[in-house]
Amino acid sequence: MMQHMEERELEVKRYWNEVSDSEWYRSLRTEERLDRLQKDPKAAFYPGVLELMAKHVGDFRGKKILLPSSGDNHAAFAFALMGAQVTSADISERQLENAGQISERWNLDIEYICDDTTRLSKFGDGTFDLVYTSNGTLSWITDLAEMYRNIERVLKKGGYSAMYDVHPFTRPFTMEAWKAPEIRKSYDDVFPDLYWRVQDIVNASARAGLRILEMAEIRSADASFWYTFDELKTKTAEETANINDWKHNPMAAIPAWIAMIAQKQA
């Protein structure tokens, strides 16, 4: 079992080290994109997600925030720009290297740690005010219960766990824009794709000792939810107009994203 976990961890690490320098990820580090984020840190978050956290956490200034599976690190930059003490953790050394170059250029004091999100083995108990996982994290997690146990462990008493990811309600469908819904699998077929259900996320959090405070179901705000990076490059404004209106695009009738915030007992 342990050998299998180590093999998967190496596989995931190799994948993201390669993806970090792909055209898609380089597009997230363009001067135009970063300049917009630096001027408006809120731009790093999907509409409604930052507001959900701020409603419960309050002012981020001075807060110790951990971002496991930090990916493009836009959220890490944003929290640091808002005055938080940020620690970015990712399984990919290359992701952290690329992010570190940006934060150094911007003179942001962000700590970068290469670690597995499930175990968070390099972090002590009761360290952080907020742990935030964002889009794309959960589909790579093989043991959701362990991940939330360790998130609860590294949180201070009264600290917060926040997540934002693709809504599990989309999982049974092919999610092809403009087409009638086409079911490809049962909602309960979690494996082998590791597509967690809403109950899996909620139960793993609650059983870890985190009290669910609020959940938000968020609809798609742009065309990027419906198309890959390469597909988007070929689309015109006319082709993506009304894409988030369910009367034109039937699959837009269900929420695209889910966000949740929970709290460790004080």
Task: List the predicted regions and their residue ranges.
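A short SAM/SAH-binding and catalytic strip from SAM-dependent methyltransferases
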Residues: 129-145
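A short acidic, Gly/Pro-enriched loop at the edge of an enzyme's catalytic core
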Residues: 121-130
